[in-house]
Amino acid sequence: MNLKIAIIVICQLVYFTQGDTVPSKPLSVDYQAEFSWDLYKKLYPEFRRNMVISPYSLRKIFVCLHQLTDAKDPATTKFSKQLHKVFKFNPTGQLPDLVRRRYENQREAYAQDQGLNTTTLAVVLGRKKKTTHALNNLPKSCGIFARSLKSGSPKQMTRSLNAAMKNISNGAAQSFLSESDLNRDWDFFVADSWLFKGFWRYQFEEEYTTTCNFYTNAKKKGLMRFMYLEEMLRVGHFPQWNVRAVELPLHRESPFSCVLMMPVAADIEELIESLSHKRFKEIYDNMSASKTTVRLPQFRLRMKLSAKSMLEQLGFDTAFKESVFRVFEKDGAIPLGDAIQKMDLSMAHEGEDLAKTYVDRSLGQQFTAHQPFMFVIFDRKELVPIIVGNVVAAITPKDVGPQSDEKLCDNPPRFNGR
């Protein structure tokens, strides 16, 4: 059996929310954030469907894997150049202190919440030779553990890997890998798992849940359950940027938050194409608190992405095609088989506090996500996108009932794009 190594990254996110949001501080060029927006913008035209991804996590994986390379190896030089070109990261040998501190701060932020679990597991399969000091002692900010597993059938190896992941994550990660995820020709494998279930600052009012149409375009629609929330929220309407936005704060102790964005008139692709770290910061900083009614479809997105197929199209192929990573003390370097990211994201009613009861008759601001919209879950301190995604087609539940009357569906809203 060929040499096999698996690195499994699990980030189970049951995000919690903040109270009052502090306006962001002026930021210089943030390459971590810029890469997140760039990769998302490049992927959307290829998918053109409901999607969710964590570009931030993919970047962190490859930045940390650079610690397993030999600076004297020509393959490392090519790998470093591609890291700089594609991931906007300039490797300088050891993980720079600034990057190390940033990853450590983010790792500590994840650990603040009981519902958050992040685990990275490096697994050697079918090999008894001693692993390198570098593999076993990657920077703590990377959060990577190392394990060795015996070779066996795909079923046995999958079961062993899943058991190891479950054990290290304290039961949070279960049955992440399937037999089809393992390729016997791989030497090195990365699995990146994210689970997010929004636990909001304010609970959506379940008694006002309605079944209404979600419009993919002017002709195509489908039924979805829409959640209802009326509360003082940060909101913005910016025709100059073709965007309407609202912030759904997570639990008050969370360092993260969520912003929903819809185009004002043009198609969502034009909105996505216009986004960058600078533009998102402009949008976020210009939002203001106002009484706001939000109608958001209740949905769950699950997605599997191959980093290899995505990144090779962007010119990042050395890691997969050449022997770059040194994981054994007496053996040469080996390539990476793939980095598979699995996302499981749910938007549901659960929240920390009940929304306030308003006695005034003013309608306030309205944000009804009845047509293609995008969402970003981000670090409030630096506005770094952690998870980015979009809903462009109805996700109709199997047990959905008949459409609610027009009044409950806002008489009803219609698609306003092109």
Swiss-Prot record:
Give the residue range of the signal peptide: 1-19
Q: In which tissues is it expressed?
A: Female salivary gland (at protein level).
Name it. FXa-directed anticoagulant
Q: Which UniProt keywords apply?
A: Blood coagulation cascade inhibiting toxin, Glycoprotein, Hemostasis impairing toxin, Heparin-binding, Immunity, Lipid-binding, Protease inhibitor, Secreted, Serine protease inhibitor, Signal, Toxin
**Annotated function:** Anticoagulant and antithrombotic serpin-type protein inhibiting host coagulation factor Xa (F10). Does not inhibit host uPA/urokinase-type plasminogen activator (PLAU), kallikrein, granzyme B (GZMB), matriptase, elastase, alpha-chymotrypsin, chymase, coagulation factor XIIa (F12), coagulation factor XIa (F11), plasmin (PLG), thrombin (F2), trypsin and cathepsin G (CTSG). Inhibits factor Xa-induced production of pro-inflammatory cytokines, such as MCP-1/CCL2, TNF-alpha/TNF, IL-1beta/IL1B, IL6, IL8/CXCL8 and IL18, in human endothelial cells.
Give the organism, scientific name: Aedes albopictus (Asian tiger mosquito)
Please tell me what else the database record remarks about this protein: Binds to heparin; binding to heparin does not affect the interaction with host coagulation factor Xa (F10). Instead, heparin may function as an anchor that targets FXa-directed anticoagulant to endothelial cells. Binds to phosphatidylcholine and phosphatidylethanolamine but not to phosphatidylserine. Heparin-binding site is also required for phospholipid binding.
**Which parts form a coiled-coil structure per UniProt?**
none
Q: What processes in GO biological process is this protein linked to? A: immune system process
* Gene3D superfamilies reported in the protein's UniProt record: Alpha-1-antitrypsin, domain 1, Antithrombin, subunit I, domain 2
Would I find Ubl conjugation among this entry's keywords? no
Carbohydrate-modified residues: 117, 167, 286
Q: Main subcellular localization, coarse class?
A: secreted
Q: Could you state a single Gene Ontology molecular function term? A: toxin activity
SMART domains per the UniProt record, alphabetical: SERPIN
The protein's assembly and partners: Interacts with host coagulation factor X/F10 (activated).
Q: Which domain of life is it from?
A: Eukaryota
Q: Tell me the compartments it is located in.
A: Secreted
Return the GO cellular component terms, semicolon-separated. Answer: extracellular space
Q: Which family does it belong to?
A: Belongs to the serpin family.
InterPro entries attached to this UniProt entry: Serpin_dom, Serpin_fam, Serpin_sf, Serpin_sf_1, Serpin_sf_2
Record-linked PANTHER family:
GH10112P-RELATED, SERINE PROTEASE INHIBITOR, SERPIN
High-level lineage: Eukaryota, Metazoa, Ecdysozoa, Arthropoda, Hexapoda
